[in-house]
Amino acid sequence: MYERVSKKAQVQISPFTKIGYGFYTGHNICMIVNGATVIGNNVNISQFLNIGTNHNTPAIIGDNVYIGPHVSIVENVKIGSNSSIGAGAVVTKDIPDNATAAGVPAQVLNYNNPGRYVGNRYKYNHEKLRQ
């Protein structure tokens, strides 16, 4: 199945990538995600995402994060929970929780309405998951 999906949808997500509950991809998507990457719960990703590393140092994406189209996330960065990354951003440094960031390189623009673009949130119970 991995092979069929990756060729048809132009999706390359390593089987070693850790992905949380409620992961959502919209539109016609094309993405490349490195195997060291950790993706939290309720992460919404738009088309043409690239998460890469040359040194196997993971990018860590928190919970309830929206990532806009044409975003590149480079190397060892952490994107905080409830954050939004604007279209075309190149993330080279950590983004704090509850932030909206955009630009090349990505910079925090504000802390208003964190995570507002995350729709269809999966409701999970951490205690039940541990059992």
Predicted stretch roles:
Residues 1-6, 11:
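Charge-rich, low-hydrophobicity low-complexity segments
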Residues 9, 14-15, 20-21, 26-35, ...:
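Left-handed beta-helix
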Residues 61-73, 104-131:
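C-terminal segments of enzyme domains that contribute to small-molecule binding surfaces
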